[in-house]
From Swiss-Prot:
Pathway of action: Protein biosynthesis; polypeptide chain elongation
PANTHER family documented for this protein: ELONGATION FACTOR P, ELONGATION FACTOR P (EF-P) FAMILY PROTEIN
Domain of life (superkingdom): Bacteria
Alphabetized UniProt keyword annotations: Cytoplasm, Elongation factor, Protein biosynthesis
Sequence similarity: Belongs to the elongation factor P family.
Subcellular location: Cytoplasm
GO biological process entries: peptide biosynthetic process
GO terms under cellular component: cytoplasm
Organism expressing this protein natively: Lawsonia intracellularis (strain PHE/MN1-00)
Broad class of the protein's primary localization: cytoplasm
Protein name: Elongation factor P
Amino acid sequence: MYSTTDFRKGLKIEIDGVPYDIIDFQHFKPGKGGAMVRTKLRNILNGRVIDNTFRSGEKVERPNLESRDMQFLYHEGSELIFMDLTNYEQLHMSEDVTNGKSEFLKDGQQCRVLLYNEKPIDIDIPLTLILEVIETETAIKGDTVSNVTKPAKLETGVVIQVPIFINIGERIKVDTRTKEYIGRE
Protein backbone atom coordinates (compact mmCIF):
# COMPACT_ATOMS: atom_id res chain seq x y z
CA MET A 1 0.00 0.00 0.00
CA TYR A 2 1.04 3.58 -0.63
CA SER A 3 0.48 6.55 1.64
CA THR A 4 -0.19 10.05 0.28
CA THR A 5 3.33 10.93 1.44
CA ASP A 6 4.65 8.50 -1.24
CA PHE A 7 2.83 10.32 -4.07
CA ARG A 8 4.95 11.54 -6.98
CA LYS A 9 4.37 12.07 -10.69
CA GLY A 10 4.26 8.78 -12.56
CA LEU A 11 3.37 6.67 -9.49
CA LYS A 12 0.76 4.00 -10.28
CA ILE A 13 -2.04 3.56 -7.72
CA GLU A 14 -5.31 1.61 -7.58
CA ILE A 15 -8.66 3.10 -6.51
CA ASP A 16 -11.81 0.94 -6.41
CA GLY A 17 -10.14 -1.77 -8.51
CA VAL A 18 -9.02 0.63 -11.27
CA PRO A 19 -5.33 1.43 -11.92
CA TYR A 20 -4.37 5.11 -12.20
CA ASP A 21 -1.20 7.02 -13.06
CA ILE A 22 -0.53 10.19 -11.03
CA ILE A 23 -0.12 13.05 -13.52
CA ASP A 24 0.08 15.85 -10.94
CA PHE A 25 -0.34 16.29 -7.19
CA GLN A 26 -0.33 19.14 -4.69
CA HIS A 27 -0.29 19.14 -0.88
CA PHE A 28 -2.48 21.84 0.68
CA LYS A 29 -3.92 22.74 4.09
CA PRO A 30 -7.38 24.29 4.13
CA GLY A 31 -8.35 26.89 6.76
CA LYS A 32 -9.66 24.25 9.11
CA GLY A 33 -9.17 20.53 9.21
CA GLY A 34 -6.20 18.38 8.27
CA ALA A 35 -3.88 18.60 5.30
CA MET A 36 -5.07 17.24 1.96
CA VAL A 37 -3.51 16.10 -1.31
CA ARG A 38 -5.11 17.14 -4.60
CA THR A 39 -4.27 14.83 -7.50
CA LYS A 40 -4.84 14.61 -11.22
CA LEU A 41 -5.06 10.94 -12.21
CA ARG A 42 -5.08 9.19 -15.60
CA ASN A 43 -7.03 5.95 -15.83
CA ILE A 44 -4.54 3.45 -17.27
CA LEU A 45 -7.28 1.31 -18.84
CA ASN A 46 -9.11 3.99 -20.84
CA GLY A 47 -6.92 7.13 -20.65
CA ARG A 48 -9.53 9.37 -18.98
CA VAL A 49 -8.22 12.01 -16.58
CA ILE A 50 -9.94 12.68 -13.24
CA ASP A 51 -9.30 14.90 -10.22
CA ASN A 52 -9.27 13.30 -6.78
CA THR A 53 -8.56 14.65 -3.30
CA PHE A 54 -7.07 12.51 -0.51
CA ARG A 55 -6.69 13.20 3.20
CA SER A 56 -3.04 13.45 4.22
CA GLY A 57 -1.78 10.04 5.34
CA GLU A 58 -4.59 8.16 3.55
CA LYS A 59 -3.59 4.76 2.17
CA VAL A 60 -4.21 3.59 -1.40
CA GLU A 61 -3.66 0.20 -3.02
CA ARG A 62 -0.68 -0.68 -5.18
CA PRO A 63 -1.94 -2.02 -8.55
CA ASN A 64 -0.91 -5.44 -9.82
CA LEU A 65 0.98 -4.06 -12.84
CA GLU A 66 3.78 -5.92 -14.56
CA SER A 67 5.87 -5.06 -17.59
CA ARG A 68 7.25 -7.95 -19.66
CA ASP A 69 9.57 -8.16 -22.66
CA MET A 70 7.71 -9.83 -25.50
CA GLN A 71 8.09 -10.45 -29.20
CA PHE A 72 5.32 -9.48 -31.60
CA LEU A 73 4.52 -12.51 -33.76
CA TYR A 74 1.62 -11.57 -36.07
CA HIS A 75 -1.85 -10.01 -36.54
CA GLU A 76 -4.88 -12.31 -36.50
CA GLY A 77 -7.90 -10.20 -37.44
CA SER A 78 -8.09 -7.47 -34.80
CA GLU A 79 -5.95 -9.50 -32.38
CA LEU A 80 -2.22 -9.08 -31.82
CA ILE A 81 -0.26 -12.20 -30.93
CA PHE A 82 2.84 -11.81 -28.71
CA MET A 83 5.29 -14.36 -27.31
CA ASP A 84 6.68 -13.99 -23.80
CA LEU A 85 10.48 -14.17 -24.11
CA THR A 86 10.96 -15.85 -20.72
CA ASN A 87 8.53 -18.79 -20.92
CA TYR A 88 7.58 -18.73 -24.65
CA GLU A 89 3.84 -18.56 -23.91
CA GLN A 90 1.65 -16.79 -26.45
CA LEU A 91 -0.45 -13.81 -25.40
CA HIS A 92 -3.45 -12.46 -27.34
CA MET A 93 -4.22 -8.74 -27.18
CA SER A 94 -6.92 -6.63 -28.81
CA GLU A 95 -5.69 -3.94 -31.23
CA ASP A 96 -8.04 -1.42 -29.55
CA VAL A 97 -5.98 -1.50 -26.34
CA THR A 98 -2.80 -0.18 -28.02
CA ASN A 99 -4.10 3.32 -28.87
CA GLY A 100 -2.78 3.12 -32.44
CA LYS A 101 0.68 1.87 -31.49
CA SER A 102 0.01 -1.46 -33.22
CA GLU A 103 0.35 0.30 -36.60
CA PHE A 104 4.11 0.35 -36.03
CA LEU A 105 4.57 -3.32 -35.08
CA LYS A 106 6.61 -5.54 -37.41
CA ASP A 107 6.62 -9.33 -37.21
CA GLY A 108 9.43 -10.38 -34.86
CA GLN A 109 9.76 -6.95 -33.23
CA GLN A 110 10.48 -6.87 -29.50
CA CYS A 111 8.54 -4.55 -27.19
CA ARG A 112 7.36 -4.28 -23.60
CA VAL A 113 3.79 -5.27 -22.78
CA LEU A 114 2.12 -3.80 -19.69
CA LEU A 115 -0.10 -6.29 -17.86
CA TYR A 116 -2.73 -5.53 -15.21
CA ASN A 117 -3.80 -8.64 -13.27
CA GLU A 118 -2.17 -10.76 -16.02
CA LYS A 119 -4.28 -9.02 -18.72
CA PRO A 120 -2.47 -6.96 -21.40
CA ILE A 121 -3.44 -3.27 -21.29
CA ASP A 122 -0.73 -1.44 -23.27
CA ILE A 123 2.49 -1.79 -25.24
CA ASP A 124 5.66 0.29 -25.19
CA ILE A 125 7.34 0.78 -28.53
CA PRO A 126 10.41 2.94 -29.25
CA LEU A 127 9.77 6.67 -29.72
CA THR A 128 11.37 6.47 -33.17
CA LEU A 129 11.57 3.61 -35.66
CA ILE A 130 13.40 3.05 -38.94
CA LEU A 131 10.87 1.80 -41.52
CA GLU A 132 10.97 1.15 -45.25
CA VAL A 133 8.70 3.01 -47.69
CA ILE A 134 6.80 0.40 -49.75
CA GLU A 135 4.36 2.63 -51.63
CA THR A 136 4.41 6.32 -52.61
CA GLU A 137 3.98 8.58 -55.61
CA THR A 138 7.04 9.53 -57.65
CA ALA A 139 8.13 13.15 -57.48
CA ILE A 140 7.70 15.31 -60.58
CA LYS A 141 10.69 17.46 -61.51
CA GLY A 142 10.01 21.09 -60.67
CA ASP A 143 7.67 20.19 -57.78
CA THR A 144 9.84 22.06 -55.29
CA VAL A 145 7.55 24.48 -53.49
CA SER A 146 8.68 24.64 -49.86
CA ASN A 147 7.50 21.85 -47.54
CA VAL A 148 5.66 19.80 -50.15
CA THR A 149 4.65 16.41 -48.76
CA LYS A 150 3.00 13.30 -50.13
CA PRO A 151 1.49 10.18 -48.52
CA ALA A 152 3.73 7.13 -48.16
CA LYS A 153 2.81 3.63 -47.01
CA LEU A 154 5.42 2.03 -44.76
CA GLU A 155 6.30 -1.65 -44.31
CA THR A 156 3.98 -1.96 -41.29
CA GLY A 157 1.02 -0.61 -43.27
CA VAL A 158 0.83 2.82 -41.65
CA VAL A 159 0.51 5.81 -44.02
CA ILE A 160 2.35 9.04 -43.14
CA GLN A 161 3.23 12.28 -44.91
CA VAL A 162 6.81 12.44 -46.26
CA PRO A 163 8.77 15.02 -48.31
CA ILE A 164 8.47 14.65 -52.09
CA PHE A 165 12.09 13.48 -52.50
CA ILE A 166 11.41 10.19 -50.64
CA ASN A 167 11.11 7.18 -52.97
CA ILE A 168 9.98 3.56 -52.70
CA GLY A 169 12.57 1.36 -50.96
CA GLU A 170 14.09 4.15 -48.85
CA ARG A 171 14.40 3.69 -45.10
CA ILE A 172 13.12 6.62 -43.05
CA LYS A 173 13.00 7.55 -39.36
CA VAL A 174 9.47 8.01 -38.00
CA ASP A 175 8.20 9.47 -34.69
CA THR A 176 5.77 6.83 -33.38
CA ARG A 177 3.89 9.28 -31.11
CA THR A 178 2.99 11.81 -33.83
CA LYS A 179 3.31 9.58 -36.94
CA GLU A 180 5.62 12.16 -38.49
CA TYR A 181 8.63 11.84 -40.77
CA ILE A 182 11.88 12.76 -38.97
CA GLY A 183 14.54 12.04 -41.59
CA ARG A 184 16.26 9.52 -43.83
CA GLU A 185 18.20 6.63 -42.39
